[in-house]
Swiss-Prot record:
PSII is composed of 1 copy each of membrane proteins PsbA, PsbB, PsbC, PsbD, PsbE, PsbF, PsbH, PsbI, PsbJ, PsbK, PsbL, PsbM, PsbT, PsbX, PsbY, PsbZ, Psb30/Ycf12, at least 3 peripheral proteins of the oxygen-evolving complex and a large number of cofactors. It forms dimeric complexes. The keyword Chloroplast applies. This is Photosystem II reaction center protein K. The chain crosses the membrane at residues 23-43. It comes from Lepocinclis buetschlii. GO terms for cellular component: chloroplast thylakoid membrane; photosystem II reaction center. It is found in: Plastid, Chloroplast thylakoid membrane. The lineage of its organism: Eukaryota, Discoba, Euglenozoa, Euglenida, Spirocuta. One of its GO terms (biological process) is photosynthesis. InterPro entries: PSII_PsbK (IPR003687), PSII_PsbK_sf (IPR037270).
Length: 48
């Protein structure tokens, strides 16, 4: 059994991209926001 810390198992950004690290942490949430937007839109039009 191999034990890895989180950074080794997921991977590190290359050094040139380290300023974008906080942005990369947020990017996977964006599709969920579109899903939430679809429900809000349907609620606004009363689920026609």
């Amino acid at each position: 059994m191999f034990l890895f810390n989180l950074e080794q198992s997921i991977g590190l950004l290359p050094e040139a991209y380290l300023p974008f690290d906080p942005l990369v942490d947020v990017l996977p949430i964006i599709p969920l926001l579109f899903l939430l937007l679809a429900f809000v839109w349907q609620a606004a039009v009363k689920f026609r």
